[in-house]
Design a protein with these regions (language model features):
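Internal, conserved structured core segments that host functional sites
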Residues: 86, 96-146
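A conserved C-terminal secondary-structure "cap"
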Residues: 193-271
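Short, structured loop/turn "capping" segments at alpha-beta junctions
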Residues: 118-119, 180-184, 215-219
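Catalytic cores of processing enzymes, dominated by hydrolases/peptidases
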Residues: 129-212, 248
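Hydrophobic/aromatic beta-strand patches that form the interior of the parallel beta-sheet core
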Residues: 46, 89-91, 121, 181-186
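N-terminal short beta-loop-beta anion/metal-coordinating cradle
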Residues: 1-93
C-alpha cells in the first residue's frame, strides 16, 4: 500500500462497492455521501496523508494560544451489508487539493484495489434549465458502454456529451485507466442556483444510489433538508424577480413632468 495512506483496519469484505465524494457544484456529492455515511455509521478503514496534498495557509488562535496547522481530512470507511450482499467502502474528502489531483485520484483507486472493490461510484451536479420547483432527474455516466444498460433500465437520463469537473469527475477517468468499473450519478440543479447547497438533487441521487447498491437507509432527514431548501429557493427566486422588475420598470407616479411631456411629443403620439 502506498505511503500516502494510513490503514486503520483490514476487514474481510464481500465484493465491496465504493462511493467517493468531494465538495463540488451545489455541494451535491458531499450532501449525499455524508448523509449516507452518517446513517450507515461505517467503521474507520483508512485515511490519506493530508500534508502531502494540502498546504496550510494559516493557523487558528484560541485564547491567544496558537494551534497546530489543520488539514482537510480524506477518510475511508467500511460498512458490512447483510450476508450475501455486497459491502460498501465510503470515501469522504473534506476538500479538493489545489494541485496533485491526479495523484489523489490514483491514491483513492489504490485503496479500492487493496480491498477488492468491484465498482466505484461518484456523485455530481448536472446544471440544466430545470426550474427549482421541478423534481430533479438523475443522469448517469459510466466508464463502459455495458454499464449504461442498467442505468437506462432504472430510468436514468443519458446526457450525452458533458463535463464532470473536479475529483468527482477525474476519479472516473483514473478508474477507467486502471480498468475499474465506475459510474457517476448526477442530480439536476438549476443553472441559476449552482452556488447554493442543493439537498433536493442530493436526495434524488441518494434514492437512486440506494436502489442500485441494494441498501436500506432512512432518508427522512434528507427529505426535510430538501423541503427546507425548496422553500429557500422559492424565496430567493421571488426576491430576484422583484429586483428584476424594480430595476427595469418605474412606477408612473415617480416620473417627472418633463418625462411625460417627452412621451406626449414623441412621433406617432395621438394629438
Amino acid at each position: 500500500m502506498s505511503s500516502l495512506v494510513k490503514i486503520h483496519a483490514r476487514p474481510k469484505l464481500h465484493e465491496p462497492n465504493m462511493l467517493a465524494a468531494w465538495p463540488g457544484i451545489a455541494n451535491v456529492a458531499m450532501i449525499a455521501g455524508s448523509y449516507l455515511a452518517h446513517k450507515l455509521n461505517p467503521k474507520p478503514l483508512a485515511e490519506v496523508v493530508a500534508p502531502y496534498f494540502f498546504d496550510p495557509i494559516g493557523v487558528l488562535v484560541r485564547d491567544n494560544v496558537v494551534e497546530s496547522p489543520q488539514f482537510p481530512e480524506s477518510r475511508f470507511f467500511y460498512w458490512k451489508n447483510t450476508p450475501g450482499k455486497k459491502d460498501l467502502i465510503i470515501f469522504i474528502g473534506d476538500d479538493q487539493p489545489s494541485s496533485k489531483t491526479y495523484e489523489m485520484a490514483h491514491t483513492v483507486i489504490d485503496v479500492a484495489e487493496r480491498f477488492g472493490v468491484k465498482r466505484l461510484y461518484t456523485c455530481a451536479a448536472a446544471l440544466t434549465r430545470i426550474h427549482h420547483s421541478e423534481q430533479p432527474k438523475v443522469w448517469g455516466a459510466a466508464t463502459r458502454e455495458p454499464l449504461l444498460d442498467d442505468l437506462k433500465a432504472r430510468g436514468l437520463v443519458m446526457g450525452g456529451d458533458l463535463q464532470i469537473s473536479g475529483l468527482n469527475g477525474l476519479l472516473l477517468g483514473v478508474a477507467k485507466e486502471r480498468q475499474l468499473d465506475a459510474i457517476c450519478l448526477l442530480g439536476e440543479v438549476p443553472q441559476y442556483a449552482s452556488r447554493f447547497p442543493n439537498p433536493i438533487a442530493a436526495l434524488s441521487i441518494a434514492e437512486t444510489m440506494l436502489n442500485i447498491l441494494d441498501i436500506e437507509v432512512d432518508l427522512a432527514e434528507l427529505k426535510e433538508q430538501a423541503t427546507e431548501a425548496a422553500g429557500r429557493l422559492k424565496e430567493m427566486a421571488a426576491e430576484a424577480m422583484g429586483d428584476y422588475i424594480d430595476y427595469f420598470t418605474e412606477p408612473i407616479w415617480e416620473r417627472g413632468e418633463s418625462e411625460e411631456e417627452e412621451e406626449d411629443d414623441s412621433p406617432g403620439s395621438p394629438n
